[in-house]
A protein has these predicted regions:
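Short loop/turn motifs that connect adjacent beta-strands in outer-membrane beta-barrel proteins
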Residues: 4-11, 38, 73-83, 131-137, ...
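Transmembrane beta-strand segments that form the barrel wall of outer-membrane beta-barrel proteins
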Residues: 9-24, 40-53
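Membrane-spanning beta-strands of outer-membrane beta-barrel proteins
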Residues: 12, 24, 61, 118-120, ...
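Transmembrane beta-strands of outer-membrane beta-barrel proteins
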Residues: 16-20, 42-46, 87-91, 140-142, ...
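Extracytoplasmic loops and strand-loop junctions of Gram-negative outer membrane beta-barrel proteins
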Residues: 11-14, 104-111, 159-165
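Outer-membrane beta-barrel "beta-signal"
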Residues: 65-70, 170-197
Length: 197
């Protein structure tokens, strides 16, 4: 007589990428873990380092963010990591953008990540929509406070020449996310998209 497989211990995790960053040629990858009691923790990293010195082209952006989320609504009661969520988001980032003329660099040139970083603290709201057995689309917006230094420079004889230092202190939208989410873990699949419970 065949024995039934022992039930696995439920585990809820997700790997994701923000497709808006991907469209902007900024590769990124994130992970989210369900903590229990409708709470999860998420972290993301993005890194783009494209450049062409001869054409004064720089498209460089890297940083990370982390969120603590609380999930609510009917879908969240059925299964973790789906439905509505609200949370607190923190971002640290630096960038260097130049498209032939004036360049814009976040933070202090030649500094370390802490020196060069801009920081963001924000509140976020989102909704994670099942689209396949192990896939969701997560739509998230965040708004809060962004602060840090920006350096403006011009290309002169093949070298960047400083023009101005500006301190940014900004309240408003800080993040837009449309992420493709891959669900990982025992019992972490969408019932109505090909899974069985």
């Amino acid at each position: 007589v065949a024995q039934a497989a022992a039930p696995c211990r439920p585990f809820y995790m997700a790997i994701k990428t923000n497709m808006l960053y991907d469209l902007a040629a900024v590769p990124n990858l994130g992970a989210e873990f369900y903590l229990g009691k409708n709470f999860s923790i998420a972290a993301n990293y993005m890194h783009a380092w494209w450049k062409n010195d001869a054409k004064n082209f720089y498209w460089r952006y890297y940083g990370a963010d982390a969120s603590i989320r609380w999930w609510f609504g009917k879908p969240a009661r059925i299964k973790p990591l789906q439905g509505h969520h609200i949370g607190v988001n923190y971002q640290i980032l630096t960038c260097d953008f130049q498209l032939g003329k004036t360049g814009l660099m976040a933070g202090m040139p030649n500094g370390n990540m802490v020196d060069r970083a801009n920081h963001i603290v924000a509140l976020e709201y989102g909704y994670s929509l099942p689209i396949a057995k192990r896939l969701n689309l997560d739509f998230t917006i965040a708004g809060g406070y962004h602060w840090g230094l920006f350096e403006e420079y011009e290309p002169v004889d093949g070298h960047p020449v400083w023009q101005a230092t500006k301190r940014r202190q900004y309240f408003g939208p800080t993040k837009v996310e449309i992420s493709l989410v891959w669900l990982i873990g025992c019992d972490n699949y969408n019932k109505d998209k090909g899974g069985k419970r």
